[in-house]
Amino acid sequence: MGARASVLSGKKLDSWEKIRLRPGGNKKYRLKHLVWASRELEKFTLNPGLLETAEGCQQILGQLQPALQTGTEELRSLYNTVAVLYCVHQRIDVKDTKEALNKIEEMQNKNKQRTQQAAANTGSSQNYPIVQNAQGQPVHQALSPRTLNAWVKVVEDKAFSPEVIPMFSALSEGATPQDLNMMLNVVGGHQAAMQMLKDTINEEAAEWDRLHPVHAGPIPPGQMREPRGSDIAGTTSTVQEQIGWMTGNPPIPVGDIYRRWIILGLNKIVRMYSPVSILDIRQGPKEPFRDYVDRFFKTLRAEQATQDVKNWMTETLLVQNANPDCKSILRALGPGATLEEMMTACQGVGGPGHKARVLAEAMSQVQQTSIMMQRGNFRGPRRIKCFNCGKEGHLAKNCRAPRKKGCWKCGKEGHQMKDCTERQANFLRENLAFQQGEAREFSSEQTRANSPTSRNLWDGGKDDLPCETGAERQGTDSFSFPQITLWQRPLVTVKIGGQLIEALLDTGADDTVLEDINLPGKWKPKIIGGIGGFIKVRQYDQILIEICGKKTIGTVLVGPTPVNIIGRNMLTQIGCTLNFPISPIETVPVKLKPEMDGPKVKQWPLTEEKIKALTEICNEMEKEGKISKIGPENPYNTPVFAIKKKDSTKWRKLVDFRELNKRTQDFWEVQLGIPHTAGLKKKKSVTVLDVGDAYFSVPLDESFRKYTAFTIPSINNETPGVRYQYNVLPQGWKGSPSIFQSSMTKILEPFRSQHPDIVIYQYMDDLYVGSDLEIGQHRAKIEELRAHLLSWGFITPDKKHQKEPPFLWMGYELHPDKWTVQPIQLPEKDSWTVNDIQKLVGKLNWASQIYAGIKVKQLCKLLRGAKALTDIVTLTEEAELELAENREILKDPVHGVYYDPSKDLVAEIQKQGQDQWTYQIYQEPFKNLKTGKYARKRSAHTNDVKQLTEVVQKVSTESIVIWGKIPKFRLPIQKETWEAWWMEYWQATWIPEWEFVNTPPLVKLWYQLEKDPIAGAETFYVDGAANRETKLGKAGYVTDRGRQKVVSLTETTNQKTELHAIHLALQDSGSEVNIVTDSQYALGIIQAQPDRSESEIVNQIIEKLIEKEKVYLSWVPAHKGIGGNEQVDKLVSSGIRKVLFLDGIDKAQEDHEKYHCNWRAMASDFNLPPVVAKEIVASCNKCQLKGEAMHGQVDCSPGIWQLDCTHLEGKVILVAVHVASGYIEAEVIPAETGQETAYFILKLAGRWPVKVIHTDNGSNFTSAAVKAVCWWANIQQEFGIPYNPQSQGVVESMNKELKKIIGQVREQAEHLKTAVQMAVFIHNFKRKGGIGGYSAGERIIDIIATDIQTKELQKQISKIQNFRVYYRDSRDPIWKGPAKLLWKGEGAVVIQDNSDIKVVPRRKAKIIRDYGKQMAGDDCMAGRQDED
C-alpha cells in the first residue's frame, strides 16, 4: 500500500491537522490528503515512501516544480500538499498552504545562492549523472533501468501527448548525449516519430556546424577539440569527451544542447499528434469554466513556444477566449488574478440561471445612487475624467467642448486614441515645458515639410527665443520651439564657457563630452565608456552652456572624443525633448512567422564587375538613406547579385529574398486584381503618372530591418564584406506590394475626398487620372496631386508623366474615345522551347480580351507533363493551324470603347468547338467593351449545355468585378432545349436573364431521359461488383422477363462495373428500355446527359443512348430486399464480394426485443451497417424515448471500483462500477446495512481483482464490518479525493443507466431482483461503445489482461539483469565482457560495461545467465543492481 497512514504519527499528525487549506478558510488538512497524495505519486512513477521523510519530500518537490507552469490543477494541489508535509517534517510552524509555499520558496532561494557560490568557489559540476569519484575526478553514472522504464511507460501510455515533454525534461536532467541516445533507442519502435526526431536533430546539428566553424591549424596541447554537431548528438564522441566538454572551463553543456534539440523534435511530434491550436480553444456558451481551463492547458502543453510566450498566452488568451459571461467577471478581477481566484469567481457561471441572477443584480442596483466596484467596495465612487477637455464628471463622448484634433493620448493627427501605438512619445516627459494639449498647436503642414522619415528635436522653452531653425507662431498661448531635423546628424553651434564650438545633440548619451577646449576652474579625473572602449576625461563642474539661446549650468567632460557631444544632462535642463511627429508614412509592423528566425544564407562568389557595380549602387542608395551599413552583430544574411538592364550597359541590383519570404508572416493582398480599361468611363481629360522608386519611398518597420541584411563581398576576400540592411521596402520581398498599396491608398484618400469629380485608378506605382475638366484646369489639379504626393516623399518623374494621348497604361494603349492592348508581335521561330510556348500563350491570352476568336487549347496541350523550360517542343498540325489562325486575327488592330453607365450591358457567347467558347461584351453592336475566351473543362463527363452555363457564370463574375452589374446574355441555344435540360438536371445553378440568338453551331441535347417508367418496355436490374485486392469484377443484369447475363472483368473497380452493367443493358435491349441501378455514381453521370467524356465506357453508353428512342433510368437502394436488385446483386457478387447480404436483420431485431442492446452491439454482432442498426433502435418504442447515454472512459488504475446504493420500487440496489471499464455488479439487498454491504464487497473481491473501493460517507460504508472486510481482503477504502471533480460521478451515472435499462426489461421479469440482473447482463455484454468499441464486459477483461501482461513485462525486465553479455566491438574482433544486460530489443541489446553504456547489435552479442559472482569487480555491480 506504500506510504499511507504511516507517513505521520503523534505530534506531527496533530500539527498536520491544524494547518488550513486556504488562508482564512475553515477546511484543514486531514489524513485523507496524505492518502490521496501517495496515490497521485504512484501515477507519476514516484515512490510514495518518500513522503515519510523531509528529504524525500524535498526530492518530490524538486521533480514536480519544473512541470508546475504547464501542469494541471491536480499537479499543483499535489505540490502544495507535499510542501506543507515538508514543513511539518521540519517542524516549521505554518498556519496555511500559502505560508508553507513561501517558506519553501525562501529555502529554495537560499539553496540556489549557496549552490552558485559553491560552484563558483570549486568550479566543480553538480550535474547528475556526472559524479565525482574518490579522487575528485568527474565520472559518468549511467541512467538507471528504473528511469528508462519510466520513460518507456510514459511514451506508451501518453502516446506523444503534451505530457511527454515535461516528463522527458524531468527524466533527462543533467544527462549526457549518450544517456539521451539510450532514452531514444528504448522507444525506437515508434518509427515515424523517431524519423521526425532524427530529421530535427540533423537540422540542428548542421546549423551548429554552420555557426561554429572548425578553427584552422592544430589543437594546442592539453586543450580539447571543439564539439561538432555530430559530437553533440553523441554519434562521433565518447562519454569521456562529453564529460570533458560538460565539466571543462569554460564548460560546453553538450548534454543540455542535445536535450534542447530533442525537445524541439518532440514539440513537432506532439504538434502532429495534437493538431489543435491554442487559438482555437474557446469556451462554449454553457461550458463550465473548469472544463475550459482543462482543455486550454492541455493544448497549451502541445504549443511550440518558449515559456515566456506560454505565460503570455495564459495571461491573455485564457481571458480573451472565455465566453462573455466569464470574460466580464475575469476582467473585473484584474490582470493579477491567480487561476484559483478565476475558477472560484467563475463557478456556476453560464446558462439561464446565471442570466437571471445577473439581471436581478442589475435591477437591484438601479435604485442605488453610487456605483460600487466588484472588488474594493469601500474605495468610494469612481471618478471619471474627459479625455477631450480634461474636466472631471463626464466622458469624452458626452463632452460639449469642441473636439480636439488628433489623438487624445499623443497629440498626433491621423489616428484616434484607440489606435494609438505611442507609449512614451517624449523621453523625460516630466521636463516638457508645455502642459496638456499645447504641443498640438503645430500645423500638420509644418511637420510634413521635412523628409518622409524625419524625426525632430524640439526645444520646449517657455520664452519666445529667436533661433534659425525655429518656427514662429503668433498668439497669446503659442510658444516658439526651435526645431532640428534628424534626417541628418543634429550638429549645432553652442557657446560653452564663452567659446563657440560645433557639437552633436545626442539624446542617447548620458554626459556632455568635448574635445580641444580650455575651461576655467578645477577639474577631477574620470574614466567613461566611449565608442571603442574606455577614455580618460577631465570633469569640470558648474560650467555655463548656451544652446539656441537657452542657458544652463552643468557638468562638462573634456577628453579625446571623436565628436563633441551634448548629452542628456544638459538637454533635459533646457527642456529639450526627442519628438516623433506623425511620420508622413507610418511604418506597418511586420513579424516573422512563429518559431522562425531570419535568413542566414551565405553570399555566393561574384565577378569583379558585378562587385564594382553593386558597390556603386549601394553607395548611392546609402547616401539616399535607403540602406544603412551594419556591423557584425547582425547574424542574418541574404544573397545579392547583379544583372544588366535590358538594352543597357547599366547594372541592376537583385536580392534573393526567397528564404526571407518563407520566414516572413503572410500578408493580405490589398488589391485583388488589376483594373481593366473596359471599366473606365469616357473622360474629357486624362493623365497617366508613374511613381518613381515606389517601394523605396516607404519606410520598413525598424524592428524588421535587421532581417534584410546583405553583404557585398570583396575580390579574393581581400577585405571583409561590406554589410548593409534596408531602411525601406525592398524589391522582391513578399511584403512590399501589400504595404505599398496600403500606404498609397491612405495617402491618396485626402485628395480623393477633396476632389470627388476626379477619377484616380491606382495599381502599384501606375496612376490613371481622369476628369471632365478643361485641359488647363485638369493639368492644374494634376500638379496639385503631384505636390501632394511629393509632400509624402513620392516623386512622379517628368519622363513618365504622360500628358498627351495615346497613353500607355498597365499594358494598354488609351485613346480619347477608344482603347486597345499595346501592339503584340508573335515571334517567328523554327524551333520552340517550353518557355517560348509559355510566353506565346501568355501573349495570346492577353490579346484575347479585345481580339475575338483567339484559341490556345492546342498550344497548351504541348505543355502537358513535367518538362524543363529549355526542352524543345515540336508543334502538332493542330497547334500550327491554331497559331496561324491567331496570327490572322492579330493582323488587323481592334479597339474597344469606354463604358457608358447610362446604357445596358450585353454579352454574346459563341461555340468554337473542341470545348472552346468565345464571348463579347458591348453596349452598342460592333463596339465591344471587352472580349474573352473560355476553354476550361470542369468535369470528366460533360455536355455543351453544362459548359455554356460555366461560360455564363464566368462572364457574370467578370462583369460584376469590372462594371458592378450583370449583362443581358445572348446565347446560341433554343429555349426548349434549355428548359428540357434544366427541368431534370439535379445540380441546379442560377442563370441570369438571357435570349436566344441563332449563331451556328447551336447547342443541342443529343438524347433525353424519360421522367416516368415506359409501359411495356423490358426492365433491366443492373449491378456490378469488384474486389479491391484482386481487381477482378463482374457486371450483369436480370430482367423482369427472366433474362439474365453476367460478364467477368479484370483490372476494374466497383464504379466501372456499375457502368459496364448499364452498357450491357443498353446493348441487349430494344429501342425502349427501363433500367434500374443501385449506384448513385452511375445515376449522377447519366442523368447529367453528357455528350462526351474522358471515360471510354461512358462514351460507349452515350453512343447507345443516342441510338435509343426512349430510356428510363431509376435508382433503388442496395441490400434492401428489392426483388430484381437482390437477384442481380447475388448474381454478380458470387466469388467477388466477401460480405454479401444482411441475413442478420431478423436475428438482430429479435435480439433487440429481448435485450434492447445499442446499435454498436448489433452492428458488431450481426454484421449490420450502422444505418440499419440505428434504424432498428429507432423503431423500438422503448428505446426511442430518450437519447442513448454517452459513455466516457476515466483514466484510472485497473483495481479501482466505485460503490453506491440506489433505490427503486422501495428497495435498495447496491451497485459497484469498475471505473476504468464501466463494468457493473449490482444486487438487490434486504437492507442498507454494513453487514449486507460487507458481504457484497467480499463477493465482488472473489470475482474480480479489487484494490480500491471509492464510496460516499453513508453509514453502511463507514461501518466496522466493511472496514474489517477491506482489511482482510487487502482493499483500500476511499471516501473522496480532494479537488477531484469525478468524486462519485461514475457510479451515479451508472445508476441512472441501470434504472433506464431496468425500465426497458421490467415487463419481462416478475421480481425486481430478476430485472436488476437482466439489466446488468444487458449493460455488460449487449451495449458497445467507448474506446475500441468494446462492451463493458469485454473491456474489463481486456484491461485486466493488459495489466497482467504489463506486470509480466516488468518482471522480465528485472529478470534480464541476471544475465551477462559478451560482445564484440565493430572495430575490435576480440570478444569483451562480461557486461551487464540492461535491455534486450529485437535487433540490439543495451549493455553496461563498467561505467560505459553501449548499444550492441544482437549478432555481435552473446547473452549468458550469471551463475555466480565473479572474483573481481562484481561487488560494485551487484550493489548498483540492488540500488536499481
UniProtKB/Swiss-Prot annotation:
Motif (Nuclear localization signal): 26-32
GO annotation terms (biological process): DNA integration; DNA recombination; establishment of integrated proviral latency; proteolysis; symbiont entry into host cell; symbiont-mediated activation of host apoptosis; symbiont-mediated suppression of host gene expression; viral genome integration into host DNA
CCHC-type zinc finger span: 384-401, 405-422
Region called Interaction with host CALM1, residue ranges: 8-43
Residue stretches making up the RNase H type-1 domain: 1014-1137
Binding-site positions, Mg(2+) 2: 1023, 1058, 1078, 1129
Gene3D superfamilies named in the record: 1.10.10.200, 1.10.1200.30, 3.30.70.270, Acid Proteases (2.40.70.10), HIV Type 1 Reverse Transcriptase, subunit A, domain 1 (3.10.10.10), Human Immunodeficiency Virus Type 1 Capsid Protein (1.10.375.10), Immunodeficiency lentiviruses, gag gene matrix protein p17 (1.10.150.90), Integrase, C-terminal domain superfamily, retroviral (2.30.30.10)
GO MF entry, a single one: RNA stem-loop binding
Binding-site residues for Mg(2+) 3, renumbered to this chain: 1204, 1256, 1292
ZnF (Integrase-type) residues: 1143-1184
Database matches in SUPFAM superfamilies: Acid proteases, DNA-binding domain of retroviral integrase, DNA/RNA polymerases, N-terminal Zn binding domain of HIV integrase, Retroviral matrix proteins, Retrovirus capsid dimerization domain-like, Retrovirus capsid protein, N-terminal core domain, Retrovirus zinc finger-like domains
Phosphotyrosine modification, residue list: 128
Protein name: Gag-Pol polyprotein
Region (Interaction with membrane phosphatidylinositol 4,5-bisphosphate), start-end ranges: 73-77
Residues within the DNA-binding region(s): 1363-1410
Start and end residues of each Integrase catalytic domain: 1194-1344
Stretches for region Interaction with host AP3D1: 12-19
Origin species: Human immunodeficiency virus type 1 group M subtype A (isolate U455)
Binding site for Mg(2+) 1: 690, 765-766
CC cofactor: Mg(2+)
Domain Reverse transcriptase residue range list: 624-814
Region entry Dimerization/Multimerization of capsid protein p24, spans: 273-359
Location of the region described as Interaction with human PPIA/CYPA and NUP153 in the Swiss-Prot/TrEMBL record: 185-223
Binding site for Zn(2+): 1152, 1156, 1180, 1183
Motif Nuclear export signal: chain residues: 16-22
Active site: 506 (for protease activity)
Activity control note: Protease: The viral protease is inhibited by many synthetic protease inhibitors (PIs), such as amprenavir, atazanavir, indinavir, loprinavir, nelfinavir, ritonavir and saquinavir. Use of protease inhibitors in tritherapy regimens permit more ambitious therapeutic strategies. Reverse transcriptase/ribonuclease H: RT can be inhibited either by nucleoside RT inhibitors (NRTIs) or by non nucleoside RT inhibitors (NNRTIs).
